[in-house]
């Protein structure tokens, strides 16, 4: 078997990477157990997203604080700025987040100072990995 890319792990990061590689590539995803044992599948919480431009500075500061200011600032910027597009891409693949009257619902978790977490019931990880597979 010829393989162009080997991805170790079947969590969200590995699955998302596989889906963003060129279609002609032969991709092999390996895991030490099964998909239901991945940390991503077991994750109950949600996924943080930049709600609007007014949210940027507090999101940036919350992320730095949560990382004890050891974060790579450029990586934090990329994560925050790309979050909305990634959410839209996940939704285009069928991932469902909680909504009310057609509007996404946001909650607050961990180090976040405002509601910016999208979630699916209490099984966000299962929802995302299930749809990416």
For the regions a language model picked out, list residue spans one by one.
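Conserved N-terminal/central alpha/beta ligand/cofactor-binding core
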Residues: 35-133
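N-terminal Rossmann-like FAD-binding beta1-loop-alpha1 element of flavoenzymes
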Residues: 3-29
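A short, basic/flexible loop-to-alpha-helix module at the beginning of a structural domain
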Residues: 1-2, 109
């Amino acid at each position: 078997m010829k393989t162009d890319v080997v991805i170790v792990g079947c969590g969200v990061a590995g699955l998302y990477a596989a889906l963003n590689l060129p279609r002609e590539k032969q991709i092999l995803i390996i895991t030490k157990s099964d998909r239901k044992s991945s940390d991503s599948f077991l994750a109950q919480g949600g996924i943080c997203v930049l709600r609007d431009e007014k949210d940027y500075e507090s999101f940036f500061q919350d992320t730095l604080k949560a990382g004890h200011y050891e974060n790579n600032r450029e990586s934090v910027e990329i994560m925050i700025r790309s979050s909305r597009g990634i959410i839209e891409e996940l939704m285009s693949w069928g991932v469902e987040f909680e909504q009310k009257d057609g509007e996404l619902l946001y909650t607050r978790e961990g180090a976040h100072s405002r509601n910016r977490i999208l979630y699916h019931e209490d099984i966000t990880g299962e929802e995302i990995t299930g749809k990416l597979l």
